[in-house]
């Protein structure tokens, strides 16, 4: 009985958390991962009872499930350690350019997670008025306008000069954010081709996302790049961290991080 409760309680927590993420309405289907985790925990909980029937298939399934949990824990542990290396990044002083990575926007303005990025960028820009800010983000299927347009409007309303902000409104993911922003910098400098960027550049995004943003920038040819970490609501951090784990794993397997 105690063993069963130990399994059921975490499964219920995962399912309840998944419902909370669903209710936020982020436009992503990643909340389903929490239901999948809940199902995996329940399966792990009740398989031992089924194994008493001495079915070879049940025993094999039990072993495979344990191996999957070990692999899952190892991947999550390693990636979260990597994410932690940039979790409190403050960026270098006197940056030439700052790239604010796009995130969800709504009809009434940036979503909360996007505001955190913009507010962090604003803090830096107020202290470094010579830094050129690039807001990067295209228009998602659930968004009223390109993210970059609404992000710039927000910064201008907060007092950042419009001429200090460049908009890159075509990107639909982090890799495109980096590549298209790089092309914009090269165009502004009058450089041709796909030259490396020697300027000091900062990547502004939420703390869980900084590591991947910086690594993608280095891979894209930014030689002097640093991260600037913005706040994340702790309640949503488990979902954001787990989703970022998938992003890091995908980009690693695609060769975008090395």
Each model region followed by its residue ranges:
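Structural motif marking the loop-to-transmembrane transition
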Residues: 1-5, 57-61, 234-238, 242-245
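Membrane-embedded alpha-helical segments of integral membrane proteins
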Residues: 1-51
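Lipid-exposed faces of alpha-helical membrane segments in multi-pass integral membrane proteins
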Residues: 9-16, 39, 67-74, 78, ...
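A structural signal for short, hydrophobic/glycine-enriched beta-strand patches
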Residues: 71, 77-243, 247
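Transmembrane alpha-helices and immediately adjacent membrane-cytoplasm interface residues
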Residues: 43-89
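Structural signature of transmembrane alpha-helix termini at the membrane-water interface
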Residues: 16-26, 46, 50, 74-85, ...
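Charged, glycine-interspersed solvent-exposed loop segments at helix/strand-loop junctions
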Residues: 236, 255-258
